[in-house]
């Protein structure tokens, strides 16, 4: 008689130091031996059921006594219960299910095994062994969980599957035990991977949390196809989810920095300054961090208190930058009329005198503070507007008369100090320094600027006419200033009131980068340390010579290309033949007489 094999699960095979084991297909014997995975040294190693089973032939089984057969049945049950108690993803093979239910040997029309079919009249080598008694028909193993608890999305084209048989539901690598579909059939329908991770956005998580709060965690997990552990975790971080963007999927990043103690002490410093009402800047936080690091003997190469560190530290402690809302300049109601009038006056002068590009300029005075007050402060996220104190020296300033030409050149800065005399000291070259009691531009200083700066500009020729654009400040349009400009063969153009932000080149392209550069140099000077302190504990203001050097560096950093683009943007140096560049010109309506803003002196015929 031909030998028959019956599986007996005695132990699990352990594979050492193998990350992958190639699974071979069985050609003979029971085909329902399903693939399992066991854990060996932290890695998942696949094995076959027949590799952990023992086989008996009919002759060998008949030799055994009833006590031996009962012993093997008990060993089988103990081994299987042990595997389930260890929570191994071990499915109950179809063979064991049929043995426990005391199924008859298949002699019906057709019996389908995995990959083998026995027809009605075909003799089968397989029959139910004697050791599978009816007492094993009732199983006490845990029932499998439904698909929803695993977050599976079954394709719609697969027909409805029958109910689960007893056994642990292991679907990742071997298919679905108890189903008519084999593992290969299931693998061809959808792709499963044990290492697959799914991510959910904050909007979805909030929806699950709200459903869980109205019902319970289990119902929410089943309803949305997620794990119950995820529901518990999401309920713990509900405030963060509500404050986050709806499409945010993760809250990654270290919760503590490399130097957690430094971060903690800087955060305490920020709270202390907030309680006093003093403004806190990121530069001040960096300076404080360097001071703390020096006290803790942290090497400078290991901790530099960079701007990136400051941003990450603020993110860890829920701090943000609060910006001062600037007051916008309200444009005049008759904006269009003033723009057209100004453009027509400039075009009339240019067509009358045909200025060289290097002879068209723009000049204006601007205040530059010695101690630039910060427009931002560090505060808690979501706080209402707050009031902060200032050092009290933001009004200590100087006045700088700046000038630029349409070809991109910059005129020497004309500095006006506040006081009755120029203090002694070493000042940078390339600038003119004057003083005034209040630090303002006056009529006399304006005439002095025309003599020492405008008349001495590079390329100025006595008989070559020029054009200078100024704002409506009262000292610009006095009779003495107009007379001096006429003697210099220069036409004056006054920008209409309220439109300097749109028509003055210095406002458009110069002032912002200039002030930003001065602020950056002042911040670097603060971070350098070794500051002299006042009796109240505040840092003293920088020396005058150093501050003037910062202004000179910032002035030299303004590129010529940006100045040229600024003149074109304000439609001062636009090509007269290119009508597309003349924004406000009205064809055939050029005024025969200059408008009031220009004055009759500004259109005098050239020699």
Curated annotation (Swiss-Prot):
GO terms for cellular component: nucleoplasm. Signal peptide: none annotated. Residues 589-599 have a biased composition (Basic and acidic residues). One of its GO terms (biological process) is regulation of DNA-templated transcription. Residues 588-607 are annotated as: Disordered. Keywords: Coiled coil, Developmental protein, DNA-binding, Isopeptide bond, Nucleus, Ubl conjugation. Residues 355-567 form the DDE-1 domain. It is found in: Nucleus. Residues 250-323 form the HTH CENPB-type domain. Residues 47-118 form the KRAB domain. Residues 8-29 form a coiled coil. Its main location: nucleus. There is a cross-link at residues 13, 384 (Glycyl lysine isopeptide (Lys-Gly) (interchain with G-Cter in SUMO2)). It comes from the Eukaryota. Pfam families: BrkDBD, DDE_1, HTH_Tnp_Tc5, KRAB. InterPro entries: aKRAB, Brinker_DNA-bd, CenT-Element_Derived, DDE_SF_endonuclease_dom, Homeodomain-like_sf, HTH_CenpB_DNA-bd_dom, KRAB, KRAB_dom_sf. GO terms for molecular function: DNA binding. This is Pogo transposable element with KRAB domain. It comes from Mus musculus (Mouse). The gene is Pogk.
């Amino acid at each position: 008689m031909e030998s028959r094999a019956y599986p007996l699960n005695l132990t699990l095979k352990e594979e050492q130091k193998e990350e992958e084991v190639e699974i071979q297909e069985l050609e003979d014997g029971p085909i329902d031996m399903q693939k399992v995975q066991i854990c060996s040294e932290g890695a998942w190693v696949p094995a076959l059921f027949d590799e952990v089973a023992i086989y008996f032939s009919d002759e060998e089984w008949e030799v055994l006594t009833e006590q031996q057969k009962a012993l093997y049945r008990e060993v089988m049950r103990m081994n299987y219960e042990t595997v389930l108690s260890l929570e191994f993803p071990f499915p109950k093979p179809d063979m064991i299910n049929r043995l426990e239910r005391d199924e008859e040997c298949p002699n019906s029309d057709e019996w389908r095994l995995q990959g083998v079919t026995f027809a009605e009249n075909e003799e089968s080598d397989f029959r139910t062994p004697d050791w599978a008694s009816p007492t094993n028909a009732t199983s006490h193993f845990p029932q499998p969980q439904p698909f929803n608890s695993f977050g599976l999305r079954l394709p719609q084209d697969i027909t409805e599957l029958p109910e689960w048989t007893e056994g642990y539901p292991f679907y990742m690598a071997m298919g679905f035990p108890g189903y008519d579909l084999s593992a290969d059939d299931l693998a061809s329908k959808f792709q499963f991977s044990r290492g697959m991770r799914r991510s959910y956005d904050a909007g979805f998580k909030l929806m699950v949390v709200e459903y869980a709060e109205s019902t319970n965690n289990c119902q929410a997990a089943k309803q949305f196809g997620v794990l119950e552990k995820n529901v518990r975790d999401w309920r713990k971080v509900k405030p963060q989810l509500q404050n986050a963007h709806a499409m945010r999927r993760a809250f990654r990043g270290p919760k503590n920095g490399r130097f957690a103690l430094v971060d903690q002490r800087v955060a305490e410093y920020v709270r202390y300054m907030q309680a006093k009402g003093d403004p806190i800047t990121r530069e001040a936080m960096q300076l404080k961090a360097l001071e703390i690091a020096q006290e803790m003997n942290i090497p400078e190469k290991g901790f530099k208190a960079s701007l990136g560190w400051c941003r990450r530290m603020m993110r860890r402690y829920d701090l943000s930058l609060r910006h001062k809302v600037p007051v916008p300049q309200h444009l005049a109601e008759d904006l269009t009329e003033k723009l057209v009038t100004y453009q027509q006056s400039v075009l009339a002068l240019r067509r009358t005198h045909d200025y060289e590009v290097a002879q068209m300029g723009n000049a204006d005075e601007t205040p530059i503070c010695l101690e630039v007050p910060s427009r931002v402060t560090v505060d808690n996220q979501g706080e209402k507007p707050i009031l902060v104190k200032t050092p009290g020296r933001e009004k200590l300033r100087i006045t700088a008369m700046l000038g630029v030409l349409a070809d991109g050149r910059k005129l020497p800065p004309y500095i006006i100090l506040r006081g009755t005399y120029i203090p002694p000291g070493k000042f940078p070259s390339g600038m003119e320094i004057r003083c005034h009691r209040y630090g303002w531009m006056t009529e006399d200083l304006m005439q002095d600027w025309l003599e020492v700066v405008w008349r001495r500009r590079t390329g100025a020729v006595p008989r070559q006419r020029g054009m200078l654009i100024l704002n409506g400040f009262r000292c610009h349009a006095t009779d003495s200033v107009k007379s001096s400009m006429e003697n210099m063969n220069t036409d004056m153009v006054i920008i209409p009131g309220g439109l300097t932000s749109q028509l003055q080149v210095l406002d458009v392209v110069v002032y912002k980068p200039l002030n930003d550069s001065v602020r950056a140099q002042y911040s670097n000077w603060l971070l350098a340390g070794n500051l002299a302190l006042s009796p109240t504990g505040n840092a003293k203001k920088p020396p005058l010579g150093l501050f003037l050097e910062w202004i000179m560096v910032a002035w030299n950093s303004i590129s010529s290309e940006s100045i040229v683009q600024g003149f074109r943007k304000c439609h001062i140096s636009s090509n007269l033949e290119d009508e597309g560049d003349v924004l406000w010109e009205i064809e055939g309506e050029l005024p025969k007489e200059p408008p009031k803003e220009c004055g009759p002196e500004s259109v005098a015929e050239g020699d």
